[in-house]
């Protein structure tokens, strides 16, 4: 169904929703349209602030209802972040924000990945899981941003096509971290990556230093095709989508791949095989789905009007 969201500036946003959508989902859709982070949004309907975990139907929000969007300024404040170059960044934060949140805001403004940021206040390095109020950081406080170069180094990743990727890493980075960096650069999902060094396949939870990988070492990237296979997904329009999967992939993974290809959110997808609706947490092998099997994709309209 359609609902409307009215902002304090008078702008009205139209959203496609289902009555089973949670308030979190709605805030996500608003972020997608308007770029406003969910944690800055307060949604009001019939004079009541809506809670994230509840659904539209819980609040009896029906088609063409109008919600009001207010930006959260409760506890909101400005703080400053000073870099080693002398640049000062101004951030809108709340005292309940975690250090992770602050690093994310710095990334949004400056493009510096959180894992390269160290934040210092009153001579103390701030820990990710703690909040600004834990450190008694108040409005117009100044934090200092230091880039983490401890153990920082370049390594190379060579693909089977002969392409070489350069990565900025630290010896304390895990293999998971490295795969994430490769995804950021090349778009290859971590679960399709196998990394080889000195003839040995590297395990996700281990660090570069565990494997004695030093600056300017070269890793080899092999795409995981063990158990890999193609399956087909047929839509009601008759379109057939081809997916590269593994029998150990969960139905969630498959829905994610469909979203990547077709843009259909996983929560709108129902997948059918052999007359049975497939459950998210189960794997393809649980359902005996083999190479070149065909699944049927039905769009969830339950609650939609």
UniProtKB/Swiss-Prot annotation:
Gene Ontology CC entries for this record: cytoplasm; nucleus
Function: Ubiquitin exists either covalently attached to another protein, or free (unanchored). When covalently bound, it is conjugated to target proteins via an isopeptide bond either as a monomer (monoubiquitin), a polymer linked via different Lys residues of the ubiquitin (polyubiquitin chains) or a linear polymer linked via the initiator Met of the ubiquitin (linear polyubiquitin chains).
Domain of life assignment: Eukaryota
Entry keyword set: Cytoplasm, Isopeptide bond, Nucleus, Repeat, Ubl conjugation
Location of this chain's protein in the cell: Cytoplasm; Nucleus
Name of the gene: ubi
Primary location class: cytoplasm
Residues joined by cross-link Glycyl lysine isopeptide (Gly-Lys) (interchain with K-? in acceptor proteins): 76
InterPro entries referenced in this protein's UniProt entry, alphabetically: Ubiquitin-like_dom (IPR000626), Ubiquitin-like_domsf (IPR029071), Ubiquitin_CS (IPR019954), Ubiquitin_dom (IPR019956), Ubiquitin_ubiquitin-like (IPR050158)
Protein name per its UniProtKB record: Polyubiquitin
Cross-link Glycyl lysine isopeptide (Lys-Gly) (interchain with G-Cter in ubiquitin), sequence positions: 6, 11, 27, 29, 33, 48, 63
Propeptide: 305
A single GO BP: protein ubiquitination
PANTHER family from the UniProt entry: UBIQUITIN (PTHR10666)
Organism whose genome encodes this protein: Neurospora crassa (strain ATCC 24698 / 74-OR23-1A / CBS 708.71 / DSM 1257 / FGSC 987)
Extra remark: Ubiquitin is encoded by 3 different genes. Crp-79 is synthesized as a polyprotein with one copy of ubiquitin fused to ribosomal protein eL40. Crp-6/ubi-3 is a polyprotein with one copy of ubiquitin fused to ribosomal protein eS31. Ubi is a polyprotein containing 4 exact head to tail repeats of ubiquitin. For the sake of clarity sequence features are annotated only for the first chain, and are not repeated for each of the following chains.
Family: Belongs to the ubiquitin family.
Domain Ubiquitin-like: 1-76, 77-152, 153-228, 229-304
Single Gene Ontology MF annotation: ubiquitin protein ligase binding
């Amino acid at each position: 169904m359609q609902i409307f969201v009215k902002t304090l500036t008078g702008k009205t946003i139209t959203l496609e929703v289902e009555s089973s959508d949670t308030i979190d989902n709605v805030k996500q859709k608003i972020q997608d349209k308007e770029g406003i982070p969910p944690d800055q949004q307060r949604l009001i309907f019939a004079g009541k602030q809506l809670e994230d975990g509840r659904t539209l139907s819980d609040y009896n929000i029906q088609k063409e209802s109008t919600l009001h969007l207010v930006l959260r300024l409760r506890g909101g404040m400005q703080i400053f972040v000073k870099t080693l170059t002398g640049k000062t960044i101004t951030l809108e934060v709340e005292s309940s924000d975690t250090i992770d949140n602050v690093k994310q805001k710095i990334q949004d403004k400056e493009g510096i990945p959180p894992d390269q940021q160290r934040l210092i206040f009153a001579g103390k390095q701030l820990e990710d899981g703690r909040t600004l109020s834990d450190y008694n950081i108040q409005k117009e406080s100044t934090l200092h941003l230091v880039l983490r170069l401890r153990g920082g180094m370049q390594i190379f990743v060579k693909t089977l096509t002969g392409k070489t990727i350069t990565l900025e890493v630290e010896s304390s980075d895990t293999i998971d971290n490295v795969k994430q960096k490769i995804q950021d650069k090349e778009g290859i999902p971590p679960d399709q990556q196998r990394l080889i060094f000195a003839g040995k396949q590297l395990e996700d939870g281990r660090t570069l230093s565990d494997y004695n990988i030093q600056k300017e070492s070269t890793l080899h990237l092999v795409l995981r095709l063990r158990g890999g296979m193609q399956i087909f997904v047929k839509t009601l329009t008759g379109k057939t989508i081809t997916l590269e999967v593994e029998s150990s992939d969960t139905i969630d993974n498959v829905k994610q791949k469909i979203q990547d290809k077709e843009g259909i959110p996983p929560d709108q997808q129902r997948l059918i095989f052999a007359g049975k609706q497939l459950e998210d947490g189960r794997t393809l092998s649980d359902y005996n789905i083999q190479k070149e099997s065909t699944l049927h994709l039905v769009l969830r309209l339950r609650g939609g009007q």
